[in-house]
Amino acid sequence: MNIVIIDTNCSNLLSVKTMLHRLGHNPIISDRADVISQADKLFLPGVGTASSAMKQLKKKNLITLIQNCTKPILGICLGMQLFGSISSENNGVNTLNIIHTPVKRMQYHGFPLPHMGWNTITIPKKHFLFYGIKENDYFYFAHSYCIKVCSVTISQTNYGQLFSSVIKYKNFFGVQFHPEKSGMPGQQLVKNFLEI
């Protein structure tokens, strides 16, 4: 299987690559359109700001390529948020607009922001992505922005407010948490994604 991790210059590439090695795969890290277009599965990890990530994708001519992708692609943390229509960061940053839902800064409800640490996910709809994962398994989060619960939400998390922890739209999958830092449940989710 040809697995490519898209290099946005603002992500935790090595930890994602290490997790995929543990699952018996040898992924390629690349920002080249010709390499990315040959992938069987794609990962779009991201850490940092939407504006920085979008600038990098634009600079590398990857925006249209990702928008038109027909292979399964998993956005991680900021990578998932980039699938949204616009981020409220810095008075508005246009993102990939794959799902027509905005990304908004989380509201303070007595919990510290950013949301950083372990939290559970709920699974309101049965889905193959969660095979072998128990209701209320813990996953590792580190974010201040989120996608509200919407039509593409397949799992949600409560942190003073409900937000999408996993989304799916066509071949686009997104996780707000970091599966590569989430122990066995995170590894199982990635394994399920790779078996699509």
From Swiss-Prot:
Q: Which Pfam families match?
A: GATase
| Superkingdom as given in the UniProt entry | Bacteria
Q: Name one GO biological process term.
A: L-histidine biosynthetic process
The residues covered by the Glutamine amidotransferase type-1 domain are 2-196
Cross-referenced SUPFAM superfamilies: Class I glutamine amidotransferase-like
Q: What is its EC number?
A: 4.3.2.10, 3.5.1.2
Q: Mind telling me what this protein is named? A: Imidazole glycerol phosphate synthase subunit HisH
Tell me which species this is from: Blochmanniella pennsylvanica (strain BPEN)
